Amino acid sequence: MIQRQTGRRVGAVKHRKPHDTGREHLDWLALVDVSGPFLSLPVLRKTWPALDGLTKEQRARLRAEHGAWQRGGDVGDWIRYVLRDLLGWGDALHTDGLDIFKVDVPEHDTTLVPGFVLVEPGKDVAPEATRLIGLICEGDPVRRVKGSEWSATPADRVAHLCRSHNVPLGLATDGRRWALVWAPRGGVTTTAVFDAITWNEAADLTVVRAFVSLLRRERFFAVTDDQTLPALLEASKDNQELITERLGVQVRQAVELLVAAIGRAEAAEIERGGRGLPKDVKPEDVYRGAVAVMMRIVFLLFAEE
């Protein structure tokens, strides 16, 4: 006897909610202190449909190393773990023999020497083979150094080193704060600061994954040139400039529509026997007023976003 199943579909497929890559990127960007042009959302979504993940073993190691550091362990051990193991730089990380990168800043009676560099595997330590210049500091990498002849922040100093050697990427850290620096020659400096104080918590895993996605070894040595971090930053800048240009065109069109609407409203009021605009109001005054109103709306929406 065959029993008939009722009330449910046999073999029904459960559909998972689509993964919102935009929200994932917005989540970690909200927890990173960015100054200057950075990675745009379209570039992030195209390059990382999903952020690079960490294995169960990597997460366990991260919690252990983070805990040792927070319990008073050597901050140098923590920094070495992050660079060599978490990011996987391994033998591409160099911390000795870096005098070749020394830069004198005579006007501030200061000499800059990096604390570490990332060099192409198998190459001698030299600026032309270097992908990133790093500096270890004693305090917040984006705050001025007290008691120094030069009050520039550690991030500013890394940017100076980067431009001196034509290496666009830098990293300044005190162990807790990791300031990614983009310092292209002839361009403005960008800093993106990741705070590692809660990296051992599950809620902060997205930020850790973003940090690893941007700076892991493979991003420097195992992708095509147009997929390296400097190239992605350049592409983001071009994307942002295009958005700004389009916004300018849209604002101008909106101003013209607003001025035309004001003109129609005035004509309608006069037809009804009203006075219209005061006689001393010139057309250019109306246009300037419309521009002022439209720009305030744009800035308000930008601030809200």
Question: Where are these predicted regions, by residue range?
Answer:
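Short acidic loop-to-beta-strand element that houses the catalytic metal-binding Asp/Glu
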Residues: 102-134
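Generic alpha-helix structural propensity
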Residues: 74-78, 111, 153-156
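Acidic-basic catalytic patches of nuclease active cores, encompassing PD-(D/E)XK
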Residues: 67-102
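Glycine-centered helix-boundary capping/hinge motifs
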Residues: 88, 108-111, 166
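Adenosyl-5′-phosphate
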Residues: 305
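Short, basic/polar, glycine-containing "phosphate-handling" surface segments that engage DNA
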Residues: 1-70, 125-302
